[in-house]
A protein has these predicted regions:
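Hydrophobic packing residues in well-ordered alpha-helices of helical domains and bundles
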Residues: 59, 105-112, 136, 164, ...
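An alpha-helical support segment within catalytic cores of ATP-dependent transferases
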Residues: 7, 13-14, 124-129, 134-135, ...
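ATP-binding pocket architecture of kinase catalytic cores
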Residues: 32-138, 142, 152, 176
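Histidine/acidic-rich helix-loop-helix segments that form or flank divalent-metal centers
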Residues: 250-259
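Conserved NTP-binding catalytic cores of kinases and kinase-like/nucleotidyltransferase enzymes
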Residues: 1-85, 181, 196-200, 316-333
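Active-site activation/catalytic loop segments of kinase-like enzymes and analogous catalytic loops
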Residues: 144-151, 212-249, 263-283, 295-302
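Active-site acidic catalytic loop and adjacent metal/ATP-binding pocket
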Residues: 31-37, 46, 119, 169-216, ...
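ATP/Mg2+ or Mg2+-diphosphate-binding catalytic cores
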Residues: 274-333
Length: 333
């Protein structure tokens, strides 16, 4: 029997749903596959998450953690953990990404900033790793390995190696000096849903204990959508006040908060650009190629605002972006 046959058998056994239809849903960047199941005029989500490829334990344990804190997540209705099959509640198909042209977009973002503050206050759980120095270094290596070395085959000069080392150390320091909170790690427009007027969170299984500004920069400097600068600045002030009111920030100036926000974003975008390349080179996923250049643009733009990171900005703008542009043109020809 194929894996799909086993999945069908699981559905028949656990839901008594021999008469059903399964429609594939565009998956995320992981090895998971999702289907919308229709049965007796009801809709459910079926997740195929092979335990040989994915550790499903955090998905299960953190679901309970966050639901107990009052967050709306997919409910796990049935599961076969040995095979990695799950039946989940259907939260609909409306993501924040589908609502970005709304006239009340700013209000959406303000509500989601407030929600992220509540998420941050979730107590630590055993499934949450510490977003420590080693963890951050591993993520930065994704950029240097998968984008710089493997995707564009760009050797680093001795001077560039020093620049990369000093820039990395600066980003690590900025992330580690922030308050440590519960971090979703992918809090962006494709992982936030609106279900019957209520905000819902998906793809929560990689939650860690890490820097306060991480989820905020994931939301406001989204790899898939760029907010106008004026709107972003206004929302950043809103977030500063919200985090202060929630006692997540204590005796922190706005300038220091913005510095944390900017440098945390640089680390996230370096990692993300590398992951987009890895998804293509290792996993054969072409759907993220279009996101590489906008993500690199964030890096060049933000790093240029800090004298100690100007070399990173120039290298990104003058070396990395042209090489990536050339490589993308070749891959698409």
């Amino acid at each position: 029997m194929t894996r799909f046959d086993n999945l069908q058998q699981f559905i028949n056994t656990h839901l008594n749903a021999k008469l059903h239809t399964l429609n594939a849903i565009t998956g995320d960047a992981s090895f998971r596959r999702y289907y919308r199941l229709s049965h007796d005029n009801k809709h459910l989500i079926v997740m195929d998450s092979d335990p040989k490829k994915v550790n499903n334990e955090p998905y299960i344990s953190l679901n309970q953690v966050f639901v107990e804190q009052g967050f709306l997540l997919p409910t796990i209705i049935a599961s076969d953990e040995k095979q990695g099959f799950f039946v989940l509640s259907d939260l609909g198909s409306t993501h924040l990404a589908d609502m970005l042209d709304d006239a009340n977009r700013t209000e959406h973002y303000q509500a989601l900033i407030s929600l992220s503050a509540q998420w941050a206050k979730t107590p630590a759980a055993s499934a949450m790793q510490a977003y420590n120095e080693d963890f951050i270094k591993v993520e930065l290596d994704i950029f240097s390995q998968w984008l710089v070395s493997d995707f564009i085959n760009e050797p680093l000069s001795a001077e560039q190696k020093i620049m990369w080392q000093t820039s990395s150390e600066l980003l690590i320091q900025a992330m580690l000096e922030q308050p440590t909170v519960t971090v979703h790690r992918d809090y962006h427009s494709r992982n936030i849903m609106n279900s019957n007027g209520q905000w819902a969170i998906i793809d929560y299984q990689d939650a860690v204990r890490g820097p306060l500004c991480y989820d905020l920069v994931s939301l406001l400097r989204d790899c898939y959508f760029k907010l106008p600068q004026e709107e972003l600045t206004s929302l950043l002030y809103f977030a500063y006040q919200e985090f202060t009111d929630q006692n997540l920030l204590v005796n922190t100036s706005f300038d220091e908060f913005k510095y944390w926000f900017d440098l945390t974003g640089l680390q996230r975008h370096l990692k993300a650009a590398g992951i987009f390349c890895r998804l293509y080179l290792r996993d054969g996923k072409t759907g993220y190629l279009d996101n590489i250049l906008p993500t690199l643009d964030y890096i060049a733009e933000v790093a240029a605002n800090y004298s100690e990171l100007k070399a990173l900005s120039e290298w990104t703008k003058n070396t990395i972006v042209p090489k990536v542009t050339e490589k993308l043109a070749k891959e698409r020809s």
